[in-house]
Amino acid sequence: MSKLLVVKAHPLTKEESRSVRALETFLASYRETNPSDEIEILDVYAPETNMPEIDEELLSAWGALRAGAAFETLSENQQQKVARFNELTDQFLSADKVVIANPMWNLNVPTRLKAWVDTINVAGKTFQYTAEGPKPLTSGKKALHIQSNGGFYEGKDFASQYIKAILNFIGVDQVDGLFIEGIDHFPDRAEELLNTAMTKATEYGKTF
């Protein structure tokens, strides 16, 4: 049995979002193929997720802890942010497989997804500094990145390259990409392009 972590990084539903629709299509196929696997879904836009962002409170809390302060001496807000940040790091570390689904907005990933990426790019946990340079501490995981783009980029856009680079940096060597592309540029081909992407999502669900 494997553990799959799903990171949903779009505030809309599958009826309104192509990336979420592809994610749901993938999950339906994956559940059918892997009925005993554990699946955790992290919706970075859900209020209950309480996604921490690196801000003054978090930075000052880390500084105090590095200086030897006890966790209990931090403010209540600082304790909550540090604890939640650590929980998300541990959640990623416990997963065997990771699926990330997001739109490309303004040539980049959504800000909430960037905040989540910060929680998995942690010195001493997912990578370490050595005399030879940074070394990954994460191994044995694989990832699937689902992204919707209005035009055709074929994985050469900054957003998908950023996700792949971070995952590679911390040791996730296998990062596959599923892109829902071109629908805004070619609305007359919308049905064809969307159906092609959903077919690929179904296939990934069977093989991932």
Curated annotation (Swiss-Prot):
Q: Reaction(s) catalyzed by this protein?
A: 2 a quinone + NADH + H(+) = 2 a 1,4-benzosemiquinone + NAD(+); N,N-dimethyl-1,4-phenylenediamine + anthranilate + 2 NAD(+) = 2-(4-dimethylaminophenyl)diazenylbenzoate + 2 NADH + 2 H(+)
GO molecular function terms noted in the UniProt entry:
electron transfer activity; FMN binding; oxidoreductase activity, acting on NAD(P)H as acceptor; oxidoreductase activity, acting on NAD(P)H, quinone or similar compound as acceptor
Q: Has UniProt tagged this entry with the keyword Hydrolase?
A: no
Question: What InterPro entries does this protein's entry cite?
Answer: Flavodoxin_fold (IPR003680), Flavoprotein-like_sf (IPR029039), FMN-dep_NADH:Q_OxRdtase_AzoR1 (IPR050104), NADH:quinone_OxRdtase_FMN_depd (IPR023048)
According to its UniProt record, which cofactors does this protein need? FMN
Per UniProt, subunit arrangement is: Homodimer.
Family matches, as HAMAP family: Azoreductase_type1 (MF_01216)
User: What is this protein's function per UniProt?
Assistant: Quinone reductase that provides resistance to thiol-specific stress caused by electrophilic quinones.
> What name does UniProt use for this protein?
FMN-dependent NADH:quinone oxidoreductase
Any binding details for the cofactor? Binds 1 FMN per subunit.
Biological source species:
Enterococcus faecalis (strain ATCC 700802 / V583)
Q: Which residues cross the membrane?
A: none
Please provide an example of a Pfam family that matches this protein in its UniProt record.
Flavodoxin_2
Which residues does the record give as FMN binding sites?
10, 17-19, 104-107, 148-153, 184
| UniProt keyword Acyltransferase present | no
**Could you tell me the EC number(s) of this protein?**
1.6.5.-, 1.7.1.17
Family under the similarity heading = Belongs to the azoreductase type 1 family.
| Keywords recorded for this protein, A-Z | Flavoprotein, FMN, NAD, Oxidoreductase
Q: Which major enzyme category is it?
A: oxidoreductase
